[in-house]
Design a protein with these regions (language model features):
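Aromatic-rich carbohydrate-recognition surfaces in CAZymes
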Residues: 3-99, 120-127
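Residue-level detector of alpha-helix boundaries and kinks
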Residues: 43, 77, 111-112, 146
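Residue-level detector of functional hotspots within protein domains
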Residues: 44, 58-60, 104, 110-112, ...
């Protein structure tokens, strides 16, 4: 119907392959290595932080694949894949300011703006990506010190998710969708102004692109 690919939906549909279809899963991993990061377009700059969780898809899929099948040869035969995953995490690590928590920003989730300055689900993806690449780094490539660094960063991110991205609810502690800051008064409220835009200004350009034939 349209020339567009919904990366988030494709990622979700690829997850069962990490348990059932190793050959197909490997093709998906290589696909996300090539297309997972939004390219520069006419409406958006693209890049790793356009949708951080989409950019991390290749790492999370790789981690799930290795966790279940334990195949080292695939990664050893694709050194550029490992290099690409390391580069993605390095870009993210370098984005954090010294006075910031160990949480990371994103503009979009997939087809909607991420809620808050720091989006909870995206940072859970960061934690998972740190842990996934740490295991591959150590067990496949023997990079123990690098793996230890990633696990350390994962621990810091997990700690700050629990510290800043939770609130007391009717049934106890619950996770927030996102937070506009780390101060208590900014955790549970955010301005709706930046989310109140016309449909065509929100990146949903496919609406005018449908092939009615």
């Amino acid at each position: 119907v349209t020339p567009h690919v919904w990366n988030k939906d494709m990622y979700y549909s690829s997850l069962p392959f990490t348990l059932t279809e190793p050959e197909l899963c490997k093709k998906c991993i290589l696909w996300f290595a090539k297309y997972g990061i939004k390219y520069k377009g006419t409406k958006f700059e693209g890049g790793v932080f356009h949708s951080l969780s989409n950019s991390l898809s290749v790492i999370m899929l790789s981690g799930a694949y290795y966790e279940y099948f334990g195949e080292k040869e695939f990664f050893q035969q694709h050194p550029k894949l490992y290099k690409k995953m390391k580069a993605i995490l390095q870009t993210v690590l370098e984005s954090r300011e010294e006075n910031e928590p160990y949480l990371y920003r994103t503009t979009w989730i997939s087809d909607a703006y991420a809620l808050g300055k720091y989006h909870t689900g995206t940072n859970l993806c960061m934690y998972r990506s740190f842990m996934a690449l740490a295991r591959i780094a150590e067990e496949v490539f023997g990079e123990k010190s690098y793996a230890e660094m990633l696990r350390s960063e994962a621990g810091k991110t997990r700690k700050d998710i629990e510290r800043y991205m939770t609130a007391k609810g009717l049934f106890g502690t619950q996770y927030l969708e996102g937070i506009s800051g780390i101060a208590e008064e900014k955790k549970e409220c955010d301005s709706a102004e930046k989310y109140q835009k016309e449909m065509l200004d929100q990146g949903l350009q496919f609406i005018t692109d449908v092939n009615h034939d």
